[in-house]
């Protein structure tokens, strides 16, 4: 009986440790990297197809940049800073690169590809900011 309980405890510990290690890590950014943030402003008459953005546009971005793109995250605006106020942005995309040149090289080669894809998911002119990751 003690052997069976001991074996059960070992099996449970292995199962739990496997589940914890299989979770994807979002720690792909580090100090000194470049973060390109794409803001999609909210407002009357503005539209944004989050499904298309997630399932079509961002995979396109990943294919274009390949290994130069170190990671990405997507935010969906759900509210403003005060209760019952709309989000200032419908969506925000964050792209991480080792340096500005890695971002600019892919953009120069594929600017038209990205521009042609914008109308498929939004009628908004995005606002882009390039930042250095500090922490």
Which functions belong to the PLM regions below?
Residues 18-135:
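Macromolecular interaction modules
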Residues 1-26:
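Bacterial Sec-dependent N-terminal signal peptides
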């Amino acid at each position: 009986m003690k052997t069976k309980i001991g074996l059960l405890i070992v099996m449970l510990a292995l199962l739990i440790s496997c589940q914890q290690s299989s979770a994807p890590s979002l720690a792909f950014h580090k100090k000194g990297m470049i973060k390109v943030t794409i803001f999609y402003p909210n407002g009357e008459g503005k539209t944004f197809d989050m499904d298309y953005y997630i399932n079509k546009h961002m995979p396109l971005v990943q294919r274009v940049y390949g290994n130069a793109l170190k990671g990405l995250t997507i935010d969906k605006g759900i509210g403003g800073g005060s209760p019952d106020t709309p989000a200032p942005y419908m969506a925000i995309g964050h792209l991480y690169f080792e340096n500005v040149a890695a971002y600019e090289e892919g953009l120069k080669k594929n600017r038209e590809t990205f521009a042609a894809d914008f109308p498929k998911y939004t009628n908004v002119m995005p606002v882009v900011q390039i930042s250095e990751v500090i922490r």
